[in-house]
Amino acid sequence: MKMKKILALLISGAMVLSLGACGDSAASGGGAAQEAAVEETAEAAEETTEAAEETTEAAEETTEAAEETAEAAEETAEATEETAEVAEETAEAAPAADNGGLNVCLASEPATLDPALNSSVDGATMLAHLFSGLAKWAQDENGNLEIVPDAAEELPEGVVGDDGKVTYTYKLRDGLKWSDGKDVTAQDYVFAWNRAASFDLAADYGYMFEVVDGYADIWDTEDGEEKDEEGNPIPVQKNPDAKLNVTAVDDKTIEVVLANPISYWNELLAFPTYFPVREDVVSNEAWATDPSTYVNNGPYTMTDWAHNSVITLTKNENFVDAAEVTMPVINFYLSDDANNMLTNFKNGDWLLIDDVPTNEMESLKQEYPDEFIVAGQIGTYYVCWNTNQALLPEGSDITDPAEVEKAQQEIRRAINLLYDRNYIVNDIGQAGQVPASSFVAMGMTDADGSQFYENAGDNEGFVGYYDVSNEALTDNFNEAMEILKKYYDFDEASQQFTNFPTLTYLYNTSEGHKMIGEYLQSALAAVGITMNLENQEWNTFLETRKNGDYSIARNGWLADYNDPICFLDMWTTASGNNDVQFGRGADATVKAYSLDLTDLGYDTKVEDGTWAETYDVLISDIKSCTDNETRYKLMHKAEDLLMSTGCICPLYFYTDPYMLDSSVKGFFANPLGYKYFMYTTIE
């Protein structure tokens, strides 16, 4: 989760993949409204049947048309049955909670509510209501977002030492309590940060502490005796006792040393991975799965978790700023069914929903002009390839591992040219998304204040790594075909490739993601490439993708803070978010990557090196660079290397569409996709 994954993953069905917007469906709503939905569905089914009969009569004119119509009628009937089933399930579901609280639905069951382990946007939103970090996101009197002190008395400037390291000293506020009444201490933060960064926990966002002195020692590894499935040695720590350079000077004073100055440190302090946890609480590995063992220090406590249904948060009277919390109860309903969400919103049962059916977008803009909201968001929706997926045809004469990878890089880049991104955003997304030609998202600034993405790719005539304009579709297609013909048999009569290996596209359950998958499938089928579609429930999907058990998968990333590095450091070999598997498995020893930094005053020049010898080194140089202009040039080189692999196929830059009932006042959201309800009222 980054302030990208929390700004991801990932947002959900309405084509905004916020990494935590999909998962198991949950029951909610109820009563006459759901019965009416069933009746409406039945009427729709009758109308569909009549339409099918009329179509059948028309189809008698030609056998071919009749067959096509029959297939369409079958699909319509199946869709009608599925809609009826959803409506029936909704009708039978438990009614919305009547506890005087605010009912909202962000996504399905979160994978975890442990701050160190969460990597989804919906989970981050809940954690922001449950924990208090040293800093937080807030609105000023003009409604502008800013980072302000939270558990810390103030956010002081760092002191730069002769060695270039930066020391920050924080004083905790008086009166800080855990939800069980015990005092919050500086040692709680020290423990939590070391736990999140630890080698043993291997948290997805552990690398968020890479800026802290000592992190490099924790992750300094050597080959161990055990081997993985590919026969490669499993890394072990050289220094098992290594810790972050953060200390509790006393119960209320925290001192932390950064390896070098960074501009986004305060934003990291507001990130959920930096939230405190207590050692005696988390010693129970299941602590974060049940309200009876869940101890936190934020505005709310968890009072109920009906798994796959609803999580109830109740105002924490031990919270130091409890007097400012205006909403006594928040009910987070759990669902990945956009139709179910919309039904409950229209019924008035849920006052905010973070996903809407794609096919309802245009009508909702007209019907709910003040409640259908499309907010800005710094993120990228993309397709990722598993770098270890074999793409060359059976019997290919290319066998050297490095040459195989170079060929597959070219193949992936070619396939990425076959997609019409304008069709995806205009006909499927319909929420103001912008076609993407680079990975670092629109909204990230460059060293001179311009947009980082506008300076990507170093191409004349267009921005980014390929031309996404409608005018370039034919040229892109022709270029892709010429490349693919180098590696595959092509039948001129059918204009299709005949020996491209079958692919499988993995996506998390959502109608929006499915529609995009179906479009990608059709674009490849047009040239003879078969790509099957496979959907999984959110938590299963995350695990499958993380483990590299896929060939191609849907993905998305939201900025974690306002610096392009949050889109780039996730792809280092050891990163918990390296779903592409760069530098892992078979790719660990493949020497197919090149890097030249001599034009920026560095000695680094690698021709045909491993991922660790090139990309990992480059990210390390970026993290230690103190010259701002050079640092940004290094980040452009990192994106160049990343995009040269073809493993990242950006489709569009995100927007954040959601529905908020006009009765809710005091709500705000940040650019990371987090939504804040603690200061709301219902009028």
Give the positions of each predicted feature.
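Extracellular/periplasmic solute-recognition and catalytic clefts
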Residues: 303-314, 331-394, 422, 426-428, ...
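A structural "hinge/loop" feature
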Residues: 106-128, 151, 204-205, 265-275, ...
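Append "and occasionally in soluble cytosolic enzymes with long acidic Gly/Pro-rich linkers
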Residues: 405-522, 526, 637
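Aromatic- and charge-enriched surface segment that lines or borders ligand/interaction sites
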Residues: 153-211, 255, 344, 401-407, ...
